């Protein structure tokens, strides 16, 4: 795939959805961090249902700590791996208060030092909460990048690095959201909706329909 085709792909994504964003509901960097921590192996819909009850009660590190672990788990128990995730949330809140005055740091190294926060989670927060042009690669983006040949790679980091290198700079801020939405609703794992795909003619997937 060449530079001109990638340019056209993202031109089309932008024309169809000029202001893409996450489907997780949040109103602060802290709320986004908690939502992303809960979202591993869970749906955004499921996370939003839990945080719709949790955030009105506790949406700061201190308020979460005041709830206590059992209190937090009452709100997160509908989500997979909720016990581990809730412990990570409690530990993260303590660190945010002790080291960062209760604020979420806008720095990758600091974010990745928090319990349960890996590179992907850090990138989501940096991009969505702080407007940094970074690329969080999840299962949807990994699939789309490889299937279309926008940025084929054997592992998540290779795909991330290629996307950062290949995507025209003007699209980098929103590319994560366009690709994840495309993978979630059009370029699905088992039944890709090729007939409805706005980049069908540009895609290099051999089995496209």
Can you describe what each PLM-predicted range is?
Residues 2-209:
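Catalytic cores of DNA base-excision repair glycosylases
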């Amino acid at each position: 795939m060449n530079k001109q085709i990638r340019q056209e792909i993202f031109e089309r994504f932008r024309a169809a959805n000029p202001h893409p964003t996450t489907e997780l509901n949040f109103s602060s960097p802290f709320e986004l961090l908690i939502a992303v921590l809960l979202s591993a192996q869970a749906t955004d819909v499921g996370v939003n249902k839990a945080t719709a009850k949790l955030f009105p009660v506790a949406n700061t590190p201190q308020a979460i700590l005041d709830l206590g672990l059992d209190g937090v788990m009452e709100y997160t128990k509908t989500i997979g791996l909720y016990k581990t995730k809730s412990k990570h949330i409690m530990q993260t809140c303590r660190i945010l208060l002790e080291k960062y005055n209760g604020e979420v740091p806008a720095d990758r190294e600091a974010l990745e030092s928090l319990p349960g926060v890996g590179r992907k989670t850090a990138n989501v927060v940096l991009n969505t909460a702080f407007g940094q042009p970074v690329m969080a690669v999840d299962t949807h983006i990994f699939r789309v990048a490889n299937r279309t040949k926008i940025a084929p790679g054997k592992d998540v980091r290779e795909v991330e690095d290629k996307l950062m290198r290949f995507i025209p700079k003007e699209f980098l801020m929103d590319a994560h959201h366009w690709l994840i939405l495309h993978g979630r609703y059009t370029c699905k794992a088992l039944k890709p909706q090729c007939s409805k795909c706005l980049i069908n003619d540009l895609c290099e997937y051999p089995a496209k329909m």
